[in-house]
Amino acid sequence: MGQKVHPIGIRLGVVKRHNANWYANPKQYAEYLLKDLQVREFLTKKLKNAMVSNILIERPSGAAKVTISTARPGIVIGKKGEDIEKLQRELTNIMGVPAQVSINEIDRPDLDARLVAEAIASQLEKRVMFRRAMKRAVQNTMRAGAKGIKVEVSGRLGGAEIARTEWYREGRVPLHTLRADIDYATMRAETTYGTIGVKVWIFRGEILGGMKQVMNPAPAEERPAKRGRGRGEGQERRGRRGDRAADKGE
């Protein structure tokens, strides 16, 4: 029976970054890893409604830097930055070194696999039909500019007695192409019938520049303003047509 390798794990160092960037002595490695897990668990619970996608942990000498990627930065920052200052103090207590928190805003949450999986899981918990939730997620992601998406749900779908797996795919999802920018995430929906697993793969295009392009992304180009027919322009055109009709009548 064929199995799929983790789409992000196989691309680490090729077109994907690690979620933790630090070096440690063999004696300190277990301690650092445990604190990283504690930080991620703490932030996941505390920022449950902030649509957090990724947490990057870095350890410069004698300090720590935590970068939170979220679609709702206002919830993390709080009024006048009070919440983020409190968050920094709590992370400092957990990690044992001064911690700095920075926010990375996600402009298009429909292209983020974790946020899409969270949205599907949330709908399943609210008793939305799983096919409708899957189709809605696929449509929104493709409309946002994705090259392809695959969504898979498994469990007691619709309250059935026998668990099964169903999936839906649109566009291309090339899992064997290492330069392909594949975002992957899993989530669990706790329903009254049991746990339903959600998996999402999103293909956002190819990264031809490798890790250099990932570490130093090019600035987004400004979109040209749309030319719409304004009220005055439309009136002017109608006026010209009316003048031509009047000339023919004469």
Curated annotation (Swiss-Prot):
Ranges of Basic and acidic residues composition bias in the record = 220-250
**UniProt xrefs under Pfam families:** KH_2, Ribosomal_S3_C
Domain KH type-2, chain residue ranges per copy: 39-107
Q: A single Gene Ontology molecular function, please? A: mRNA binding
Keyword set includes Mitochondrion:
no
Tell me which Gene Ontology terms the entry assigns under biological process: translation
Q: Where is this region: Disordered?
A: 215-250
Q: Which UniProt keywords apply?
A: Ribonucleoprotein, Ribosomal protein, RNA-binding, rRNA-binding
GO-annotated cellular components: cytosolic small ribosomal subunit
- Function comment: Binds the lower part of the 30S subunit head. Binds mRNA in the 70S ribosome, positioning it for translation.
Instruction: State how it assembles.
Output: Part of the 30S ribosomal subunit. Forms a tight complex with proteins S10 and S14.
The record's comment on protein family reads: Belongs to the universal ribosomal protein uS3 family.
Q: Tell me the NCBIfam families matching this sequence.
A: rpsC_bact
Name by which UniProt lists this protein: Small ribosomal subunit protein uS3
